[in-house]
A protein has these predicted regions:
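N-terminal active-site segment of His-dependent metallophosphoesterases
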Residues: 1-38, 176
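Cys-nucleophile CN-hydrolase/nitrilase-fold catalytic domain and related Cys-dependent amidase chemistry
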Residues: 18, 26-109, 115, 181-201
Length: 280
């Protein structure tokens, strides 16, 4: 029996306040579910602006506890109501002064399954993330959801192939890459890195990028969200480069086995030969 997962991504622009951003994403989750979506991922730091264009402690106020905070709780209820797996990229507070760039994963019955904390934190013009986030400490977890084995790899993480591979070794079938990435800096990489990672690791990737220029800086977020399959092929069209868009795509999960039987990368990999990768 064939296995197909209908998956959704939302790329959107900053609305001006946290509550309206949360409302927009909840509405989009309902729209996606109405189209049959079984799993959905939001963009990086989904309920806020991309405040890392500046270094301002006022934005620490965007932090919430996960899963005890109100946004996780709210979307647990949404997930249960809709029967949809939700991936929620947020700004996590552990305690005052200790914050992470995190994605919570909620199963289709509303159960909180766990979190992924962004491992690689940039600190360059327009992306002053070390001011806000501590590097992740939770490894590369895989979440056993109603639609299969889901992983998360956030934005700047995507430039580091080691994490993509760790997610594959840990059993990922779909990996979501919620991002906030700017046209002038990385657009030439956007359609190269994730397809290459999907091929090398033989799973689906959902890549999400916000859209628009926000009041905090010159970063021009270019959308162009997409799903890519284990053969490196885009699943349907990519998202618009300038406008908010909800993407809903059917993922043929049987293709994963076909590709892994064709290219036995997991059989042929050589962990014993990779010691150099752990050296500074």
């Amino acid at each position: 029996m064939s296995r197909t997962v209908r998956a959704a991504l939302l790329q959107t622009e900053w609305t001006g306040d946290k509550e309206s951003m949360i409302d927009r994403h909840e509405e989009a989750a309902h729209d996606a579910a109405a189209q049959g979506a079984q799993v959905m991922c939001f963009q990086e730091l989904f309920y806020g602006p991309y405040f890392c264009q500046v270094q301002d402690p006022a934005y620490y106020d965007y932090t919430e506890e996960i899963p005890a905070g109100p946004t996780t709780k709210r979307f647990q209820s949404v997930a249960k109501e809709l029967g949809t797996v939700l991936v929620l990229p947020m700004y996590e507070r552990v305690r005052e002064g200790l914050y992470y760039n995190t994605a919570a994963v909620v199963d289709a019955d509303g159960t909180y399954l766990g979190k992924y904390r962004k491992q690689h934190i940039p600190h360059v013009q327009g992306f002053w993330e070390k001011f806000y986030f501590r590097p992740g400490d939770g490894g590369y977890p895989i979440f056993d959801t109603a639609v299969g084995k889901v992983g998360v790899y956030i934005c700047y993480d995507r430039h580091f192939p080691e994490g993509w591979r760790a997610l594959g070794v840990n059993g990922a079938e779909i990996v979501f890459n919620p991002s906030a990435t700017s046209r002038g800096l990385s657009s030439y990489l956007w359609k190269l890195e994730q397809p290459a990672a999907a091929v090398a690791n033989e799973y689906y990737i959902g890549a999400i990028n916000r859209v628009g220029i926000e009041p905090l800086g010159d970063d021009d977020f270019y959308g162009t969200s997409y799903f890519v399959d284990p053969e490196g092929k885009f699943v349907g069209d990519t998202g618009d480069a300038h406008k908010p868009e909800l993407l809903v795509r059917d993922l043929d999960m049987d293709l994963i086995k076909v590709v892994r039987d064709r290219w036995a990368f997991y059989r042929d990999r050589r962990p014993d030969a990779y010691g150099d990768l752990t050296k500074d």
